[in-house]
Amino acid sequence: MFEYLIKFYPKILFIVEGTLVTLKYSVIAVIFGLVIGMLLAICKVNKNRALRLFANFYTSIFRGTPLLIQLSIIYFASPYIIGVKFSVFMAGAISFSLNSGAYVSEVIRAGINAVDKGQFEAAVALAIPKFLIMKDIILPQAVKNIFPSLVNELVNLVKESAIISMLGEMDLMRRAQIVSIETYNYFFPMFIAACCYYILVMLISFIAKIIEKKMIVN
């Protein structure tokens, strides 16, 4: 077994290097997804019916269709729809961010609705602008309540980012596939990739628990 590992060490290193690519897509998607989700959530709780309809329609589209199809449309159909050919990186970043934003919006909306309405009414009575009420009073409490759900979304992004390999991006999955073809051994490369995904998820969960404990103390 030890000799086997020594022999395949360069291949193992090649696969593990794909972790950085996977992390890159996940981090970008969770950042932009959080921004998009927050804006959509605010639209969903807004009194303006047009904003609510738009936000709900957006969410229904991205939650109601497979991420693989969304990625394919953005990458392959964008030249025909908007006249722009996206790179693999841009197509992946855009599709993951838009998809994440739809799911995050529902999480944040639920968090906003969970905050005691009396606080909003009291702030309005004190003539505090609604923007500041949302920014300084409602959202901080909502984010604290939904933090575990946001972490779960990041974990899902790490795993779902594997579909970018379909476009030839050299992420964990794609590198494992290449090594599998080169060595005619499909178990070992996929096992290494699975271990990398597992370690990433466990690391994210560990860091999230530390942050959550500090949030509870504060």
From Swiss-Prot:
Designated gene of the protein: glnP
Domain of life, source organism: Bacteria
Presence of keyword Chloroplast: no
Protein name per its UniProtKB record: Putative glutamine transport system permease protein GlnP
Segments forming domain ABC transmembrane type-1: 19-208
Pfam family, any one: BPD_transp_1
Keywords on record: Amino-acid transport, Cell inner membrane, Cell membrane, Membrane, Transmembrane, Transmembrane helix, Transport
Topological relation to the membrane, as annotated: Multi-pass membrane protein
Location in or out of the cell: Cell inner membrane
InterPro entries in the cross-refs: AA_ABC_transptr_permease_3TM, ArtM/GltK/GlnP/TcyL/YhdX-like, MetI-like, MetI-like_sf
Gene3D superfamilies, per database record: MetI-like (1.10.3720.10)
GO cellular component terms, semicolon-separated: ATP-binding cassette (ABC) transporter complex
